A protein has these predicted regions:
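An N-terminal assembly and electron-transfer interface module characteristic of large anaerobic redox
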Residues: 1-351
Length: 351
């Protein structure tokens, strides 16, 4: 919606798409990481559907620029498109100007677009918090999902206009509505979901882990996606202090984190005042906690942030954690599975 309001005719591919895995395996070597197979498979599958004019369509994919193989998804995608007979389809790389990524003259981040994207991400994190916290306890099946859908329709215009003032108005109403919805007076075990970013959030990639946990009688707790953005920015500060990166990049990162914190502050305040919901974690506090277990120089994959998320979950009495590890994602096996026992056995980070 945010990109459509910015003048781009964007189609968001479905979150549930099992066939994408089979298509991806046809055109991507099975030694590549699972997220690459799924995301490239979805794009090729969409072009094969016949719904798009192949001479007037582009495919859009994010590119990180870090040590993760997500940096190399673009050439993998181009090869897949060529092998599938779609060599004429342009590939647009979406990045925040990181080193090692491609530039696209036809696609630019403008201030109005950034505001719309910020509002969209804030709503995404907010709905994830309130829905996952209340749905396992609903007194009537489907009640929370219906309320969620009703609010999605109401806030769509706000995503299009990018107004933070209107967001804050709706945000307080959403929290109040979900705070007052009648729930069963029972307590279920909480299960945190961490891991590689695509597998953590994509129902196709994680076999709809949130619904599965709820069906098994648990309450799923999934960390915010804005936290991952703060993690990426915080890494620029660490690189300046430890690897000689430019002071300008450090200042830009600090400024961006400050802006994000400023934008999130009203939501954090409203969440903390509520009965059912917890506030937003500071990236600086998370880095300090994680540094007691591993080096903040671990930036590949989800890096130190994955460990930090586990610590935050434990600090909020979420004592069960599912760590989503995609096949072939070597960095996450180290910073995820490699340290998963440590937060429980190291009392210092939880103090």
């Amino acid at each position: 919606v945010a990109l459509q309001a910015s003048g781009y005719h964007v189609v968001c591919l479905p979150a549930q798409d099992k066939e994408a895995v089979n298509v991806g395996l046809k055109y991507v070597n099975n030694d590549a990481c699972y997220p690459a197979i799924i995301s490239i498979g979805q794009l090729v599958e969409a072009l094969e559907s016949g719904q798009y004019d192949l001479d007037n369509v582009s495919v859009l994919m994010t590119q990180t620029g870090g040590g993760c193989r997500a940096t190399n998804y673009i050439p993998l995608l181009r090869k897949a498109l060529n092998d599938a007979g779609f060599s004429q389809v342009p590939v647009v790389s979406v990045s925040m100007g990181n080193k090692g990524v491609e530039s696209n003259p036809g696609f630019k981040f403008t201030l109005p677009m950034i505001k719309r994207l910020v509002v969209a991400f804030l709503y995404g994190d907010l709905f994830e918090r309130v829905v996952y916290r209340t749905r396992p306890y609903e007194t009537e099946k489907g009640m929370v999902d219906q309320l969620h859908q009703d609010w999605l329709k109401r806030v769509e215009a706000n995503v299009r206009n990018g107004s933070l003032t209107q967001f804050n108005h709706f945000m307080k109403k959403i929290i109040r509505t979900f705070d007052e919805i009648p729930l069963q007076e029972i307590k279920k075990p909480k299960v945190g979901v961490v891991g590689e970013i695509l597998v953590k959030y994509s129902p196709t990639a994680n076999n709809d882990i949130v619904r599965l946990l709820e069906e098994e009688g648990a309450e799923a707790v999934v960390p915010d996606i804005v936290g991952f953005m703060n993690y990426s920015l915080y890494n620029q500060i660490w690189k300046y202090e430890n690897m000689g990166m430019s002071k300008q990049s450090k200042r830009l990162a600090e400024f961006a984190i400050k802006i994000i914190e400023l934008v999130e502050k009203p939501m954090d305040k409203a969440l903390r005042k509520s009965v059912r919901f917890d506030g937003i974690h500071s990236i600086y506090d998370m880095a300090a906690d994680a540094s007691k277990i591993l080096s903040i120089g671990n930036h590949t994959g989800e890096g130190w942030f994955l460990t930090a998320e586990m610590i935050e979950l434990l600090k909020h009495e979420v004592n069960n954690i599912v760590c989503m590890q995609p096949f072939g994602c070597l960095p996450n096996h180290i910073v995820g599975k490699g340290v998963i026992e440590t937060p429980w056995t190291t009392p210092a980070p939880l103090g």
